[in-house]
Every structure is written in structure tokens, then in C-alpha cells.
């Protein structure tokens, strides 16, 4: 479904999870997914609808799954994982009346996610297993997993953690989150040779063992008000280092998320809000 071929009017729902906002399209009738140009047009905050990511809800792909979905960044590039988006898909399905249970499975581009409704506009999503092996993140130039990697960045030495939550993340611990060099370091790390598929860059400040503050510079979107997979990435990297406990609140500019990782080798659970903002019609 391209800009020229899109069937107008196009019905959509605007949703947000902790300020991370989405344009959600219902394509369960078999309508082709949008191409990169249409995604970028829809995501444009001046000439389109405006969002961090576009989500298409599609028919289920597996047994026991209620629906599948795809995600695109604001620049039109495909995304593999999005924790806030998964919760918004769940909230959309609940609002649509498509569910008979408060515990269900939805299919992302990388895996099936178990979702539970835990309160009004609150959902818990099982995000799967964190991956620390460099070749699977992917992270080049390091044969073995480390708690901290040392990179050269335009003459500076940068220390970061790295993990995949279905998409690659670098995690930089800082002393003061409000003055973290997000707009400078974020793009440089995304272009670094160590990250051949680019990377989402999280800047995290530990407040206490149960509370951290986080800002994320996302692939294809820049800094966003919240990033669910980024919250999981920051939390598990800090847990591996012993900096925080196994149940931590992550405060982002758009709201607070909860990340639980009870045991290494087990799945990570992300909990937080997901809300419908409005329904609309796009006329192109």
C-alpha cells in the first residue's frame, strides 16, 4: 500500500504508551501493509498524522495467537520489536472487543508475546529472553559477551553495555540524565562500525536499586518520550552488573514502566500504560 495507491479515506487510531505514540491501522481484512513512503508520510507531525511508529494489526500467524502486528519507524524503516507498541496493540484489541480473555498471545515480527491486562489501561507483556552474545545483537569486534564494552567514538572513549531485546540496544550509564549527551552520542553510536544494523541508544541514571531514569535515542525515530524495549535493555544490563534489583521502575520522559527479570535465562516482563488517544480518518 503506497502513497499513490492508498485507499482514502484511511481509518486509524492514535495510541500512546508512556508518551511513545503510534498510528495504528487495522489490516486484518487483508489490505496490503504500507510501504516506507506512506509510513513516513503518516508519521510526519506537520504534514501527516504524526507518531514515533506506525503499527499494522494483521490476522494471526500462529495457533493460539489472537492477532499479529508489524511496526515501522517514523522514517519508514521496519522495526523488529517495540514493548510500548505491543501494549498498545493489546489495548486496541481489548477496545475492539476482539478478546474473550484477559491473558492472550499476540505475534510481533520476532516472536509471540504473552500479554495480561493488569488494570485499567495497564498491560504486562512478556518480552522474551535478552540476548547478550555479541554476534546475535549484532555487535562487531567483540568475540565474547561483556558487562561493558569500550568503544572509540570520535577520539573519545565510551563505555556501554549491549543487548538485544529482539532489536539491538546500547546502554550508557550516566551520572545526570538531564544533561546526558543524547542528541550528540546517540547518532554517533548508531553510525558506529561496531553496530552493523545500527542500534537504539539508552542513557540511564541509577537512582536506587529499584529505580532508574532513562532516555532513549531510537533507530529511525530519534529521541522518544519512552521506549519499552529500551527500558528492558537498560534494566537487564544494570541487573547483570548488580546495579539494580530484579524488579525495577524505569522513569522515562513520558511516564514510568516496570521491568521484571526474576532469573537470568528467563523471560523479561514489561508493564505499563497503553491508551487510545483518538480515532481518525486520513484523507491523504
Curated annotation (Swiss-Prot):
<feature type="site" description="Could be important to modulate the pK values of the two catalytic cysteine residues">
    <location>
        <position position="218"/>
    </location>
</feature>
<dbReference type="GO" id="GO:0009089">
    <property type="term" value="P:lysine biosynthetic process via diaminopimelate"/>
</dbReference>
<keyword id="KW-0028">Amino-acid biosynthesis</keyword>
<comment type="similarity">
    <text>Belongs to the diaminopimelate epimerase family.</text>
</comment>
<dbReference type="GO" id="GO:0005829">
    <property type="term" value="C:cytosol"/>
</dbReference>
<dbReference type="GO" id="GO:0008837">
    <property type="term" value="F:diaminopimelate epimerase activity"/>
</dbReference>
<feature type="site" description="Could be important to modulate the pK values of the two catalytic cysteine residues">
    <location>
        <position position="169"/>
    </location>
</feature>
<feature type="binding site">
    <location>
        <position position="53"/>
    </location>
    <ligand>
        <name>substrate</name>
    </ligand>
</feature>
<dbReference type="Pfam" id="PF01678">
    <property type="entry name" value="DAP_epimerase"/>
</dbReference>
<feature type="active site" description="Proton acceptor">
    <location>
        <position position="227"/>
    </location>
</feature>
<feature type="binding site">
    <location>
        <begin position="218"/>
        <end position="219"/>
    </location>
    <ligand>
        <name>substrate</name>
    </ligand>
</feature>
<feature type="binding site">
    <location>
        <position position="20"/>
    </location>
    <ligand>
        <name>substrate</name>
    </ligand>
</feature>
<comment type="pathway">
    <text>Amino-acid biosynthesis; L-lysine biosynthesis via DAP pathway; DL-2,6-diaminopimelate from LL-2,6-diaminopimelate: step 1/1.</text>
</comment>
<feature type="binding site">
    <location>
        <begin position="83"/>
        <end position="84"/>
    </location>
    <ligand>
        <name>substrate</name>
    </ligand>
</feature>
<keyword id="KW-0457">Lysine biosynthesis</keyword>
<keyword id="KW-0413">Isomerase</keyword>
<feature type="binding site">
    <location>
        <position position="167"/>
    </location>
    <ligand>
        <name>substrate</name>
    </ligand>
</feature>
<feature type="binding site">
    <location>
        <begin position="228"/>
        <end position="229"/>
    </location>
    <ligand>
        <name>substrate</name>
    </ligand>
</feature>
<comment type="subunit">
    <text>Homodimer.</text>
</comment>
<dbReference type="InterPro" id="IPR018510">
    <property type="entry name" value="DAP_epimerase_AS"/>
</dbReference>
<keyword id="KW-0963">Cytoplasm</keyword>
<dbReference type="InterPro" id="IPR001653">
    <property type="entry name" value="DAP_epimerase_DapF"/>
</dbReference>
<feature type="site" description="Important for dimerization">
    <location>
        <position position="278"/>
    </location>
</feature>
<protein>
    <recommendedName>
        <fullName>Diaminopimelate epimerase</fullName>
        <ecNumber>5.1.1.7</ecNumber>
    </recommendedName>
</protein>
<feature type="active site" description="Proton donor">
    <location>
        <position position="82"/>
    </location>
</feature>
<feature type="binding site">
    <location>
        <position position="73"/>
    </location>
    <ligand>
        <name>substrate</name>
    </ligand>
</feature>
<feature type="binding site">
    <location>
        <position position="200"/>
    </location>
    <ligand>
        <name>substrate</name>
    </ligand>
</feature>
<comment type="function">
    <text>Catalyzes the stereoinversion of LL-2,6-diaminopimelate (L,L-DAP) to meso-diaminopimelate (meso-DAP), a precursor of L-lysine and an essential component of the bacterial peptidoglycan.</text>
</comment>
Amino acid at each position: 500500500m503506497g502513497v499513490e495507491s492508498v485507499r482514502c479515506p484511511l481509518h486509524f487510531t492514535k495510541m500512546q504508551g508512556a508518551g511513545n505514540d503510534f498510528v495504528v491501522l487495522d489490516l486484518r481484512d487483508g489490505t496490503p501493509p504500507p510501504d516506507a513512503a506512506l509510513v513516513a508520510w503518516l508519521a510526519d507531525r506537520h504534514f501527516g498524522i504524526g507518531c514515533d511508529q506506525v503499527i499494522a494489526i494483521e490476522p494471526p500467524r500462529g495457533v493460539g495467537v489472537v492477532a499479529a502486528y508489524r511496526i515501522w519507524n517514523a522514517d519508514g524503516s521496519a522495526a523488529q520489536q517495540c514493548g510500548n507498541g505491543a501494549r498498545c496493540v493489546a489495548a486496541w484489541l481489548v477496545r475492539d472487543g476482539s478478546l474473550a480473555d484477559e491473558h492472550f498471545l499476540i505475534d510481533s515480527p520476532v516472536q509471540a508475546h504473552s500479554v495480561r491486562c493488569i488494570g485499567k489501561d495497564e498491560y504486562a507483556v512478556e518480552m522474551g529472553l535478552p540476548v547478550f552474545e555479541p554476534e546475535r545483537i549484532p555487535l562487531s569486534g567483540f568475540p565474547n559477551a561483556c558487562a561493558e564494552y569500550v568503544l572509540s567514538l570520535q577520539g573519545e572513549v565510551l563505555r556501554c553495555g549491549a543487548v538485544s531485546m529482539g532489536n539491538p540496544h546500547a546502554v550508557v550509564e550516566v551520572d545526570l540524565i538531564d544533561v546526558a549527551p543524547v542528541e550528540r552520542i546517540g547518532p554517533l553510536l548508531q553510525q558506529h562500525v561496531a553496530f552493523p544494523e545500527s542500534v537504539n541508544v539508552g542513557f540511564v541514571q541509577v537512582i536506587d536499586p529499584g529505580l532508574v531514569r532513562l532516555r532513549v535515542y531510537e533507530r529511525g525515530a530519534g529521541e522518544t518520550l519512552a521506549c519499552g524495549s529500551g527500558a528492558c535493555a537498560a534494566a537487564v544490563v544494570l541487573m547483570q552488573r548488580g546495579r539494580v534489583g530484579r524488579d525495577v521502575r524505569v522513569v522515562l520522559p513520558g511516564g514510568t514502566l516496570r521491568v521484571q527479570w526474576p532469573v537470568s535465562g528467563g523471560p523479561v516482563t514489561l508493564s505499563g500504560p497503553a491508551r487510545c488517544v483518538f480515532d481518525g480518518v486520513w484523507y491523504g
